[in-house]
Amino acid sequence: MILVDYNQVMLASLFASIGNHTNVELDENLLRHMFLNSIRFNRKKFTAEYGEIVLCCDNKNVWRRDYYPYYKANRKKSRDDSDLDWNALFEIIHRIRAEIEEFFPYKVVSVDRCEADDIIATLCMEHGTELNTGSEKI
């Protein structure tokens, strides 16, 4: 199976489209297109060898904050300082995810209080899956 960190690929698609521009208006259709194009490319390239795509999704209120209260605290400050409307972006990401679950053949996995990385690590440990982070194999 091909395990994909949904939020990471979605954000990578966004930042690839906006580059270094500021005061960017979010384009939901472009973001959807870029994400699905990325998934289509990887599915076409790797499905024969590794199997089907599984989208692993982040959830709110992750368990790590119970142990590390400042987990990802710097990201909030960065988002507050950013021109990007992060609340609108997360709504778009959630809406596209719901569309994918309803209309596309991809499996979507979301676990309460877990991030995509937790899901990916668990599936790799349980199924002996080789993990390719995009830059290196683990």
Set out the residue ranges of the language-model regions.
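Long, positively charged binding patches that form subdomain-scale interaction surfaces
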Residues: I138
